[in-house]
Amino acid sequence: MATTTSITTTYAGEFAGKYVSAALLSADTIEGGGITIKPNVKYKEVLKTMNLDAITKDATCDFSDTSTLTLAEKVLTPKELQVNLELCKSDFVSDWEAISMGYSAFDELPANFADYLIGYVAAKVAAKNETNIWAGADANEGEFDGFTALLAADASVVDVVGTTITAANVIDELGKVVDAIPAALYGKEDLYIYCSQHIARAYVRALGGFGANGLGGSGVASNGTTWYNGGDLAFDGVKLFVASGMPTNDMVAAQKSNLFFGTGLLSDHQEVKLLDMADLDGSQNVRVIMRFTAGVQIGIGADIVYYT
């Protein structure tokens, strides 16, 4: 059975306007440059990590090893995923767009709907991918282990016990994360606190003042809750990265260079194929096909703070 389709459009003599869909969550962790991308991982890629103990010692006349180098590795293995949809062209015959389909018995899928469909499916995949990056679980259909699953399984990660975050406690909780950041990382250019939209909203509200958390009645620049205009956020000198796929009350403090996303070909994430079945089996179906690989991995666990 072909996938059920539902079209909402308007018609006034000629086709007017574009299809309107609900705003889609973009894969902002990728598009915003929040993690390191490995775009050409054919099957798997080994990420080498190394650690040195005390590297300087008192001088002597002899050569003596001053440090021990410990090598380790993490394996980034993208998971194969796919999208398969089938649409019946007859579903469009009674639509106001029938004029654009041509008058042949073998109607062609309207070009503007095809464009919309490609964008819609790609955006849906991007939204799911954003969630997978942070909260995915490999055991679930269409998912791979996200960062939170990997961090929870790594004993070397710096764990911070979390709670339900509100505007009243968000500053204290962010403070716990910053306090747990290793001294060697604080101040690094690519260090971020990755947080959910929920936490970012609570932080913005707290900085709006009105007595919240003792900040006074007027908030930032005496603008109250109107102070925020969508710009970058920071806390105690550490930049905040709002990751829409992050679990509601979770935070991760890490360097971008220590978080990796791997895929076979980067372009696969924005490629959807439409296959008209009329010439193949005589049906009125159009198939939408998308295949890609995706996965994430962390580098050095001891350099990551996980609040949960």
Task: List the model feature ranges, each with a label.
Residues 25, 126-135, 187, 212:
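Intrinsically disordered or highly flexible coil/loop and linker segments, enriched in small
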Residues 172-210, 219:
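Ordered core of a single globular domain
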Residues 2-57, 145-168, 204-308:
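Sequence/fold signature of self-assembling virion shell proteins
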Residues 97, 133-138, 188-196, 216-220:
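Short coil/turn segments at secondary-structure boundaries
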Residues 56-115:
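Long, hydrophobic/aromatic-enriched structural stretches that serve as scaffold segments
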Residues 95-96, 130, 202-204:
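Short helix/loop capping segments that flank catalytic or ligand/cofactor-binding pockets
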Residues 98-180, 307-308:
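Alpha-helical scaffold segments that mediate packing/assembly in large oligomeric complexes
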